Amino acid sequence: MKWLKRTAAAGMTAVMLFSCLPAAGAVQPGEELTRGETASILLEAATDYNADVTYGDILKGYPGGDLNEDGAVTRAQALVMLQRAFGGLPEPKGDNARSGYPAANFTDIPAWAQAELEDVLASGIVAGTSATTFSPDRKITKEQLELFLQRTYALEGSNLKDDFYATVNKEALDNSVIRPGYLGASAFYDLGAKVDEEIAGIIQERVDGGAKTEGEKKIVNFYRNILNIEARNAEGIAPIQPYLDAIDQAKTIEELMAVQNRVYEETGGTLFMGFGLNIDVKDNTAYTLLFDGITPSLGQGGYSTATPEQKAAYQTYVRTMLTLVGQSEAAASAAADTIWRVDAKIAAASLSNQELADVDKTYNIYTMEQLQAMFPRVDLEALFALTGLTQTNHIQVMDPGKLQAWAEIFDEGKTPDGLEILKTYARLYLAAGFGPALNEEFTEAGNAFSEAYMGSSGALSLEDSAAQYVQQVMSDYLGQAYVDRYFSAEAKADVEKMVQDILAVYRDRIETLDWMSETTKEKAIEKLDTVQINIGYPDDWDDTLKDVEILSAEQGGSFCDNLIAIQKGTNKLLAELQKTGVDENIWPMTTYTVNAGYLFTANSITFPAGILQEPFYDVDASYEENLGKVGYVIAHEITHAFDNNGAKYDENGNAVDWWTQEDYAAFQTLCEKVVKLYDGKESAPGITCNGALTLSENIADLGSVACLTEIESKRENPDYAALYTAMAEIWCSSYPRETRLYLAQADVHAPDKLRGSLVLQNFSEFYEAFDITEEDAMWLPPEERVVIW
């Protein structure tokens, strides 16, 4: 059985680095600039954009002609000079308009600068010292001026040597359009929308009379029940009303846990805590039990970094959801404040998304007795008995800090106020868990939250939303139909050859590493040679819903009933999986997923049919174009076997230390350089990359480009310019500023601009291909460049 609980892959985003800009004289980083130094830097920076500008045009003078070149310069004065240097700034379009800083929020722009700063503030390049303050009189430093220049180069997008990504993608970025209901525009989103349309077409064919098999009939029943909005609105919250009533009536933690047990038994869902399965990373032939509690909705960093607008959006969402399940406006408003406070406390004790991939931090084994001691007022044995799983005293807790924080909050339920907090969570989890299958007000609340918090616009149509639900839960039935219709044997053969070419070069690169001993190299090559390769689709097709009844409305079924049946069927499958052991040929994603992945515990790379098509792969494209696009993805996933997390697993997919102590120390030193390289680089004005959070993905990107650069070097007439241009193009993306703010603290991938630009700056071939020198903004000093694999 190749079934594995599938989760949506995190989306990818974008940033860029300009690490070294022209400077005048011997100005040191951190030092305040003089008027003369500022004018000299701006003159050199603007020459390619405003050829006739002079030093005097930029500096101008005081009455009487005194240039006061040694005088200090403020932030406001520096921006006036910048605008003079570039001859004005273009109006932001497309991505620049979406992600620029909203200067209209500034309340401290001096009257003298209002007119001269109007265009530069409207350009979106000016991030303030707070959400509403520009601090115009603060003295400007070299770093601040360089940031303003970097943002100006991105806005202009006309010089490859100053901003490679923005220039290559100028037209696409300026003309980018985000579809209603989507969070961004990119190759991933665009291809994903195309695949969604194709899957929707397959579904519609079954609905129009083409349903012959039991699986296809389940597709039709489920799809029609989702579309039956009249019945859903008429039913309202009736499916969860008994649980809401029981929550209201509970007077103790024990009575509240009885509600959770009832919810699990009758629907398969949980409210406060639950048991599950995970592949045992120390013995990947078997499963280990999992135990977890509440996870804050906004993640580990979502509360401490939230803007006032984001906090208000989340609290409005919570308030709306609670009123939809019967709470008064006053009670829901108070509860929204409480949820934020408690969520923030749990989040502060939680692991980051990067840490959650670190086996050293997540492989924490507890006994049932230890867990029972954490939750003394909960009968965990009774809760576990409902799962059908076989009990062992080997239970993994992936995030002990988060669980301990939740245990402390849960124990406060022995007080009236503490019990009310738990009741609020129970109501909210019922509303959020079942809401999408109930009346349309729940969906509208979710869409409103997405617009306010993420900056999205519009929503998917009911038909599109229904098709997406179907493809998420019925991939076993839809996957084969999709592959048969849309995936070619030629594409599979071409990609298989490219994978082998990349593996061969990767092997050569490991053999020539100067920081790794021969002992560790042998282990690394053994792991590389053992990588399992999944391309297109699996050899065998699962039917995980075989025993699940998906009843039509005529048979008494509904969207909510169908979801409950699927969840209960999933729980039953977990119990069966525990007995059968782990299938080594697991496919961790659907065949039509527009993504790719590396699975640590299987030492496998997976490239579904969904991503192996334009714009990532095109049978008619040049070798360099395919190498720079789908090749980037392939080599990236291979490198995950050797990133800071993958390096802790051996060739069999078990968490085993195969390094010498000296080699691992050298590897960690290189990882620290990668963190430093990416940390603080902007994805949009005022929004920076977290180098530690994105470390694993950045290692994979660097390894990918290193490998592909070497492959290109072996060709008779290497065309590095075409290769690197393709790389920048495939990561072209646009997001609202609100989405970028969220991704900056949650996504383990660096922003796309960095993935298609900063990574290239580590390779000498990039500089040679585009004649980039230390006089250009794209220049990265050799001592700052990092290549690991």
Predicted feature residues:
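Second-shell loop/turn segments in exported
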Residues: V27-P29, G64-E69, A104-T107, T133-S135, ...
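Stable alpha-helical elements in mature extracytoplasmic
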Residues: T34-T38, T54-Y55, P63, T74-L82, ...
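Sec-exported extracytoplasmic/periplasmic mature domains
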Residues: L43-T47, I58, Q83-E91, L121-I125, ...
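Short, solvent-exposed loop/turn elements at domain surfaces
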Residues: T47-N50, A172-V177, L298, P615
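Active-site-surrounding "flap" and adjacent substrate/cofactor-binding loops of secreted or lumenal enzymes
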Residues: N159-D163, N169-A231
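Noncatalytic, helix-rich "gating/capping" subdomain that lines the substrate-entry/channel surface
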Residues: I203-K497, D501
